[in-house]
Swiss-Prot record:
This is Uncharacterized protein UU427 homolog. GO terms for molecular function: ferric iron binding. It comes from Ureaplasma urealyticum. Disulfide bonds: none annotated. Keywords: Iron. Residues 1-148 form the Ferritin-like diiron domain.
Length: 172
């Protein structure tokens, strides 16, 4: 099946969104570590960055090759957001991940409208992964909402990493 231009466009938009967010999240990881002295929060955000720049990018790139659609890299990064504390940073990331969910929903909608069920099936992976990523970020956000201080939050994040490592799982 030949892909419609709309499907090609949303696929490229998603590819570029992942490149952009991966780069932005890498910067946020540095902020979490350098400005807020929260290395486990930084690791969490860096893992989110690596997920976007690694797994997501690779899946889209491989799928584009498989179905022979062109990918066009068109993104620029200007990290103008300057959080005053880690709670504000995580809230911003949560809001960003909510926008990603809407973007993926639109991608799925376009695929269905265009009758491209193969690409829709591919997009379902991003729906599932987006649910997991959003829930992980929301968990960290909730730690800040319910914790008394950043040290408690940092400890809770560390405990999540330790528990997941014991089970051989990754957070992101």
């Amino acid at each position: 099946m030949a892909n419609s231009q709309k499907v090609i466009d949303v696929s490229n938009a998603h590819y570029n969104l992942n490149l952009e967010l991966g780069s932005v999240y890498a910067q946020y990881a540095h902020i979490a570590d350098d400005q807020f002295s929260m290395p486990f929060l930084a690791k969490f955000i860096n893992d989110l960055s690596n997920d976007k720049l690694g797994v997501h990018k690779d899946l889209i790139s491989e799928y584009a090759r498989k179905i022979e659609i062109p990918l066009h890299t068109k993104f620029s990064v200007d990290v103008s957001f300057k959080p005053t504390d880690p709670k504000e940073l995580v809230k911003h990331i949560l809001e960003t991940e909510q926008k990603v969910r809407k973007h993926v929903a639109n991608m799925a909608k376009v695929c269905l409208e265009e009758g491209d069920f193969e690409t829709f099936s591919f997009v379902k992976w991003f729906v599932d992964d987006g649910i997991k990523d959003f829930d992980d970020v929301r968990t960290i956000h909730d730690f800040f909402e319910n914790g008394n201080n950043n040290l408690q939050v940092e400890y809770a994040i560390r405990q999540i990493f330790k528990a997941n490592e014991a089970w051989g799982r990754k957070i992101i």
